[in-house]
């Protein structure tokens, strides 16, 4: 009997947001959603609506964050960590980014809708 090795399948989501940033294609994006300077060593994807509370892993619900700030928030409500000024500074960084796999203006508009919905609750 011949036994074939099974190759594991990765279900890791590859967000164009983080991927393009890591490639250096977003030089205007220097700060995470909660502030802090982004580096290749500390960048992480933040779920605006926590994954543990039903938040989807999609661009409409993801932001770049400094890992330490992301971990501090955990699954606590976004309004405990994000001020209006912080959010406006974050999305402003994306408004002139137009890449084949990423439209910064569209991203900023969709993320704004997500944050506004969560703040109404």
Labelled PLM ranges:
Residues 20-43, 66:
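Short cysteine-rich loop/turn motifs with clustered Cys
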